[in-house]
Amino acid sequence: MEITEKAPAKLNLFLDTPFNHPDGLPEWNMIMTSVDLADYVKIESIPGKMGIKVRTNTGFLPNDSRNLAYQAARILQEKYHVRAKVIIEIRKHIPVAAGLGGGSSDAAAVLRGLNKLWNLELSLEVLAKIGLEIDSDVPFCVYSRTAHVLGKGEKVIPLKKLPPMWVVIAKPKLSVSTPYILSKIEHKELQHSNIESILDAIEREDYTDICRYMGNVLEQVTGKEHPEVLKIKNRIKQYGADAAQMSGTGPTVFGVASKSSRAKHIVNSLKGFCHEVYLVRIL
């Protein structure tokens, strides 16, 4: 038995972290959305055998227990005592270590896929709770729709569908370690924004105000470590984006535009300056 699941990239339209919990994990206050840049995850289950095997089309990902998709399969096997060998093939299109949630989305795809293959009949809410054991982005990726995400990532509140917009994603030729960036955060020194303004703009489906109130507090941290990130952000704005910012802990920067012609102009202008550039839509 096998199934293929789509694993969309995520973007942070808004990201703040007001404090760390006693266990060291950040408290998140985020607005996340999914785009049509996606990995494709084929999952095969062979009854009666045991083991987990991960294959990818890139050499940049581990294929052992460090891989989040592997962890997703192992957790479901152990929780529900399923005796089956799982073979996971990941066709990567989302850049690795980019702040786009590729690993978390792959893990969420495995949770959804095995839930179907094994007839577990678990709700998305239950899968999201399991996903939190893997990574803070997995609960959101289980749903893969625009949402307000709080806590350690476990509170996923669905929001209205965003107005139509084009998104230009630009990844420089560098990778950023999320644990390292999080370790550099000094919460009291960060300039925190108010999420209520962009939540209200989304509720009103006001594209202009959504652009006005976007923000990512971690730009202040990653930008200090990697100035190239802020240079790309400024270029995207100069080329005509209505708004631009870093996603997650970076280094990927994205810009939004209401017209495809302007978005294509931004893409063409970035070529030769930025390592990877994608033109995508919000799901």
UniProtKB/Swiss-Prot annotation:
Pathway: Isoprenoid biosynthesis; isopentenyl diphosphate biosynthesis via DXP pathway; isopentenyl diphosphate from 1-deoxy-D-xylulose 5-phosphate: step 3/6. Its EC number is 2.7.1.148. It comes from the Bacteria. It is an enzyme of class 2 (transferase). GO terms for biological process: isopentenyl diphosphate biosynthetic process, methylerythritol 4-phosphate pathway; terpenoid biosynthetic process. It catalyses: 4-CDP-2-C-methyl-D-erythritol + ATP = 4-CDP-2-C-methyl-D-erythritol 2-phosphate + ADP + H(+). Keywords: ATP-binding, Isoprene biosynthesis, Kinase, Nucleotide-binding, Transferase. GO terms for molecular function: 4-(cytidine 5'-diphospho)-2-C-methyl-D-erythritol kinase activity; ATP binding. Belongs to the GHMP kinase family. IspE subfamily. This is 4-diphosphocytidyl-2-C-methyl-D-erythritol kinase. It comes from Pediococcus pentosaceus (strain ATCC 25745 / CCUG 21536 / LMG 10740 / 183-1w).
